[in-house]
């Protein structure tokens, strides 16, 4: 089982501001804010519409401070996969509530989502009725294949980038936009900021020498990465 210190690091330590998480996950900051804090919309001539928070965030009086623990950014990472599959986020809440009930309180950051989540969600769709809003949400995420229900390819690709600890909860996330640079978010290294997985060096730490005119080879030798990894990292940052 994961130790108490690691659990605290993943759940209780604020590592990311919303702006940082927005950059790392390639999600609009405003979208992350609604996931972290919920929202209230007041359309003209209609009742107010409220949405509750759907990722783990720690309170802070100003938005410029770190608010997301690692488990929160892991949940947001999976939500972003759902979003990229084309699922309307304003309709996802009933499906998430069903996942939490059947998988656990941090279902989006759980390995059980990868192994059982598609079947769990499909049962929810069947209960909701064919053609219902919840059924359409689930069908946006899941497809039948060889007699089983599996997540669509884009969702599966995101889930495959997550590593899990012995407690079945996320412990590391590979950021796919960095390509072969193999850059990860790991709360145990670099205070959770993007690091090269092989060397543990923060991506931010290699930028200074490169911007100062050092060659790719010199920086690669100094920091234990390859020139190609540096180029991939720079391309991801510039995108």
Curated annotation (Swiss-Prot):
Keywords annotated in UniProt: Toxin-antitoxin system
Domain of life of the organism in this record? Bacteria
Instruction: Name the Pfam families for this protein.
Output: DUF433, HTH_66
Q: Which InterPro entries match?
A: DUF433 (IPR007367), Homeodomain-like_sf (IPR009057), VapB45-like (IPR017277), VapB45-like_HTH (IPR048708), WH-like_DNA-bd_sf (IPR036388)
Keyword match Chaperone = no
Q: Which SUPFAM superfamilies match?
A: Homeodomain-like (SSF46689)
Q: What this chain does, per the record?
A: Possibly the antitoxin component of a type II toxin-antitoxin (TA) system. Its cognate toxin is VapC45.
List the protein's name: Putative antitoxin VapB45
Q: What is the lineage of its organism?
A: Bacteria, Bacillati, Actinomycetota, Actinomycetes, Mycobacteriales
């Amino acid at each position: 089982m994961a130790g108490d210190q690691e659990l605290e690091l993943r759940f209780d330590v604020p590592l990311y501001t919303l702006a940082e998480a927005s950059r790392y996950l390639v999600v609009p900051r405003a979208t992350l804010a609604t996931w972290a804090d919920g929202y209230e919309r007041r359309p003209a001539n209609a009742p107010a519409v409220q949405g509750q928070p759907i990722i783990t965030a720690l309170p802070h009086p100003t938005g410029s401070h770190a608010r997301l623990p690692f488990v929160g950014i892991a949940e947001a990472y999976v939500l972003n996969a759902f979003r990229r599959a084309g699922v309307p986020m304003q309709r996802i809440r009933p499906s998430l509530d069903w996942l939490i009930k059947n998988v656990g309180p941090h279902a989006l950051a759980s390995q059980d989502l990868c192994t059982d989540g598609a079947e769990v969600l499909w049962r929810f769709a069947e209960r909701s009725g064919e053609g219902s809003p919840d059924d359409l949400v689930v069908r946006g995420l899941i497809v039948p294949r060889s007699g089983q229900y599996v997540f669509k390819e884009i969702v599966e690709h995101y889930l495959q980038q997550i590593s899990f600890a012995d407690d079945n909860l996320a412990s590391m996330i590979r950021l796919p936009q960095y390509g072969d640079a193999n850059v990860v978010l790991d709360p145990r290294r670099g205070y959770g900021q993007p690091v090269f997985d092989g060397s543990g060096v923060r991506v931010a730490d290699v930028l200074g020498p490169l911007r100062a005119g050092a060659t790719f080879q010199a920086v690669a030798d100094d920091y234990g990465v390859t020139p190609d990894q540096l180029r991939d990292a720079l391309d991801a940052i510039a995108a």
